[in-house]
Amino acid sequence: MANVTDPRDIILSPVISEKSYGLIEDNVYTFIVAPDSNKTQIKIAIEKIFKVKVDSVNTANRPGKRKRTRTGFGQRKATKRAIVTLAAGSKPIDLFGAPA
């Protein structure tokens, strides 16, 4: 980890889906991350951005889907997702920016 990068270059966006929204109750959050990032970089970035304690990080590489267009076929972008579990005593992450 010789490269010192901005944590916001690693964490691209939260995943908002029915499954990820249901996992929030268990202190598990899902993010789309940079494809070249590793679990240690993701953990440090989450702790810096949201000021929480991370218990574990699981990652999944999702291939892009082939989609039809008017002129033929196209390819959706491949993504890397990080499933982040927060420590037991950690405060929840406010993903939607609601006033406290």
UniProtKB/Swiss-Prot annotation:
Signal peptide interval: none
A single GO molecular-function term is: structural constituent of ribosome
Keyword Ribonucleoprotein: yes or no?
Answer: yes
Query: InterPro entries, per this entry?
Result: Nucleotide-bd_a/b_plait_sf, Ribosomal_uL23-like, Ribosomal_uL23/eL15/eS24_sf, Ribosomal_uL23_CS
Taxonomically, which superkingdom?
Answer: Bacteria
Q: Name one GO cellular component term.
A: ribonucleoprotein complex
Give a single Pfam family match: Ribosomal_L23
A GO biological process of this protein is: translation
Keywords noted in UniProt: Ribonucleoprotein, Ribosomal protein, RNA-binding, rRNA-binding
Biological role stated in the UniProt entry = One of the early assembly proteins it binds 23S rRNA. One of the proteins that surrounds the polypeptide exit tunnel on the outside of the ribosome. Forms the main docking site for trigger factor binding to the ribosome.
What does the similarity note say?
Answer: Belongs to the universal ribosomal protein uL23 family.
Describe the protein's quaternary organization and the partners it interacts with: Part of the 50S ribosomal subunit. Contacts protein L29, and trigger factor when it is bound to the ribosome.
Kindly provide the name given to this protein in its UniProt entry: Large ribosomal subunit protein uL23
| Protein source organism | Mycolicibacterium vanbaalenii (strain DSM 7251 / JCM 13017 / BCRC 16820 / KCTC 9966 / NRRL B-24157 / PYR-1) (Mycobacterium vanbaalenii)
Task: Specify the taxonomic lineage.
Answer: Bacteria, Bacillati, Actinomycetota, Actinomycetes, Mycobacteriales
- Originating gene: rplW
